[in-house]
């Protein structure tokens, strides 16, 4: 029998069919393999000695990584911490270059913590614009926030030469201890929210002292460490008091109409957060479960939130109670400033922070 003809090959002298396409493929494969081996050898043969060329970080990459941070940092905030640093420098007399480094460190830590807070609270607005993770996504926002924490530590090394030769202060431990406190406070705040556990006022104040007071203490402790003065009074009780005033004030304003533009309408209720007025209201009448059930629902509608604010205002008088607590704490802070020798800049900050009577948030939003 004759071999069948093929359109793709020839019949050799032995009558066997020879597939030219297979021969061509084999030849191409061999050639390709040779080229690949040449390219790999050429590219990676001396790779060990070229590794240092990979150890570069282009400025363009840095800008990409920091874009979520830059987005929020470029939106004006309250700047209370920066103002506090300047005010305390009336007493501590830190040289301006070191003071600016401290401001930068505290600013980095503060903005990074806000990036994380907004993710953890699933917020919509921050400073009147969409929160960072709604634009850049949660993974990139978290990574950037963590990166900025380490940038702050990098800045910290610039303060080491500013310490006096006999100073034994460990700046890294100082900052680390306060960041631990900050995360402890934040952790309890999140636990109460997610487990629907209403803390006592005392537990709430302890949480705030850890969480909000942490960045204030970092600033003042760094300033004390770098102060040229041989002796300084104990400023930390005042610093802690200011942190608590700041947070309770923030809690009150969140339920006020003046806060709606920047943070949204009664956002603490939507987050299910146990703020100072909410804690008081729940504890004031434990037989009434309306407010707890509203927090459980994490309402987004204006009607439910307006009802909750009216309940706190009219039934448990919690807004008035919060205002009276703030007034009491502000008076103590002013007395402490006077005892420490007076400080016009701090007194101006207290005047700025004082909450005047304002209408609670209503459904006329």
Swiss-Prot record:
Its EC number is 2.5.1.-, 2.5.1.1, 2.5.1.29, 2.5.1.10. Gene3D superfamilies: Farnesyl Diphosphate Synthase. Dimethylallyl diphosphate binds at residues 126, 211-212, 247, 254, 263, 273. Mg(2+) 3 binds at residue 250. Residues 1-11 have a biased composition (Polar residues). GO terms for molecular function: lyase activity; metal ion binding; prenyltransferase activity. Keywords: Isoprene biosynthesis, Lyase, Magnesium, Metal-binding, Multifunctional enzyme, Transferase. It is an enzyme of class 2 (transferase). Pfam families: polyprenyl_synt. Mg(2+) 1 binds at residues 117, 121. Its cofactor is Mg(2+). Belongs to the FPP/GGPP synthase family. Geranylgeranyl pyrophosphate synthase that catalyzes the trans-addition of the three molecules of IPP onto DMAPP to form geranylgeranyl pyrophosphate. Does not show any monoterpene nor sesquiterpene synthase activity. This is Geranylgeranyl pyrophosphate synthase. It comes from Melampsora lini.
